[in-house]
């Protein structure tokens, strides 16, 4: 591995550095920290080629707005892209040519789901990246080449989006002066809100692990960034995204949405039911949800953070 080809310094990828930062910031899972650093590294390579056509969103972007003691790890790269699939392929080809090795590291593999949940113009890839961790730490059987796998998603957009440039100087996984193009806070929060409503537009119950992550991001953005948000902008962006997602699900899922035209009140009712479930997470009657919450704590969070999903309905009134 030629670390001189990377944006982040070689020291950032060393095991000793991960251990030091884990101890400093209270994280428990070194594998997730390593993956998050590779997320940021790969995004910079993509950004260098695609310029202002690419924007980081999702969990990775969220961490740039949160203080270190509220940040979590993220294992995926979710991006908005104003361009074509051919441009994506050419970008990935250039990265493979620049970083690719003989042991299959830094090569992209297209993923095509058998039963997609939406018809979004989404292009998903997986890539193996080098790892300094043991097989046990990566939860893998013996491998001749230590690696981890990144998930990279491009969501094609019909027009360019606004974005903010933020450095990684306050990110738990690395001290980086590089600028990352990320979704503006109001847009990001509105996008996060559309993950609520498991039977309408949100993350479905089949993905409870993803639901718990989204609840966390919404709670922490509300707790730490609410004074920086413009409620009118959040509402405008949310309603636009919600309708898009409604119409997408209506086509692909064949659910009860088929018999209803888009109406925000249906989503609100759905969200209220979902919030009630999380409010009762410690009742002892929902072992499945409680397990996913506990798993999220151990895999993604630092020891210092206080995260109790059942407090979400009581703490926030933004959905009322």
What are the residue ranges of the model-derived segments?
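Structured mid-to-C-terminal alpha-helical surface segments
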Residues: 1-54, 66-72, 77, 81-320
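Glycine-rich beta-strand-to-loop/alpha-helix junction loops that act as flexible
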Residues: 56-61
């Amino acid at each position: 591995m030629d670390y001189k080809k990377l944006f982040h310094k070689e020291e950032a990828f060393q095991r000793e550095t991960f251990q030091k930062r884990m101890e400093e910031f209270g994280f428990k899972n070194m594998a997730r920290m390593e993956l998050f650093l590779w997320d940021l590294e790969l995004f910079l390579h993509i950004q260098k080629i695609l310029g202002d056509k690419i924007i980081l969103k999702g969990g990775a972007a969220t961490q740039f707005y949160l203080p270190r003691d509220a940040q979590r790890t993220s294992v995926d790269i979710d991006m908005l892209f104003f361009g074509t699939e051919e441009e994506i392929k050419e970008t990935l080809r250039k990265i493979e040519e620049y970083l690719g090795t003989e042991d299959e590291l830094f090569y992209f593999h297209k993923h095509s789901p058998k039963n997609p949940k939406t018809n979004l113009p989404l292009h998903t890839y997986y890539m193996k990246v080098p790892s300094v961790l043991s097989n046990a730490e990566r939860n893998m059987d013996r491998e001749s080449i230590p690696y981890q796998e990144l998930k990279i998603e491009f969501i094609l957009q019909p027009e360019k989006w606004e974005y903010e440039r933020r450095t990684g100087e306050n990110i738990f996984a690395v001290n980086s002066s590089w600028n990352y193009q990320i979704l503006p806070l109001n847009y990001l929060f509105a996008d996060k809100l559309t993950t609520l409503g498991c039977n309408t537009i949100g993350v479905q119950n089949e993905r409870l692990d993803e639901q718990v992550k989204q609840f966390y991001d919404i709670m922490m953005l509300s707790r730490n960034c609410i004074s920086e948000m413009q409620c009118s902008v959040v509402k405008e962006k949310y309603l636009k995204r919600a309708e898009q997602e409604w119409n997408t699900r209506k086509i692909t899922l064949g659910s009860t949405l088929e018999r209803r035209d888009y109406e925000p009140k249906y989503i609100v009712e759905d969200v209220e039911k979902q919030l009630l479930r999380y409010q009762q997470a410690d009742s002892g009657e929902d072992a499945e949800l409680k397990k996913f919450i506990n798993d999220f704590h151990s895999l993604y969070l630092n020891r210092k953070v206080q995260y109790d999903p059942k407090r979400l309905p009581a703490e926030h009134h933004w959905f009322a």
